[in-house]
UniProtKB/Swiss-Prot annotation:
A Pfam family hit: NusB
Domain of life: Bacteria
Keywords: RNA-binding, Transcription, Transcription antitermination, Transcription regulation
Family: Belongs to the NusB family.
Keyword Transferase in annotation: no
GO terms assigned for molecular function: RNA binding
Name listed for the protein in its UniProt record: Transcription antitermination protein NusB
Gene3D superfamilies noted in UniProt: NusB-like
Its biological purpose: Involved in transcription antitermination. Required for transcription of ribosomal RNA (rRNA) genes. Binds specifically to the boxA antiterminator sequence of the ribosomal RNA (rrn) operons.
GO cellular component, one term: cytosol
InterPro entries reported in the protein's UniProt record: NusB-like_sf (IPR035926), NusB_fam (IPR011605), NusB_RsmB_TIM44 (IPR006027)
UniProt-listed GO biological process terms: DNA-templated transcription termination; transcription antitermination
Amino acid sequence: MSSKAARRRAREFALQGIYQWLLSANSMLLIEEHVSQVSGFDKADRELFISLLRGTLNNVDDLQAEFAPFIHRAVHELSPVERAILLLATHELKHNLDTPYRVIINEAIELAKSYGGTDGHRFVNGVLDKLATQLRVTEVSAGRS
């Protein structure tokens, strides 16, 4: 298992790749290649980065459909950073079941604080907290009892 810091960096680089894809619509492989050459990538968990980037970009419509009911505007009206964070975290909530939902939400909040707008982290937290109650029913109810 990789270190917490390496996993955090993998999420940061995956976020950068998703953001690039949202703005440019470049191919996933081109983005993957570009991001993997950015300074500091050697300290990231490469396997997790690839899994997050590919898993998210291959399922954008399904992932957006999961969080869309919890936002009060159209998905395309979200800032690209918030949208990318929600896509990434939704993918993790659905597919990385070995990662606790609270870790996923906390990592998303930290990404929003670093890269998002002033209150973006509050928005991301609210959406993901509601989404987790649907995608991780047993885990969330066990944590709240």
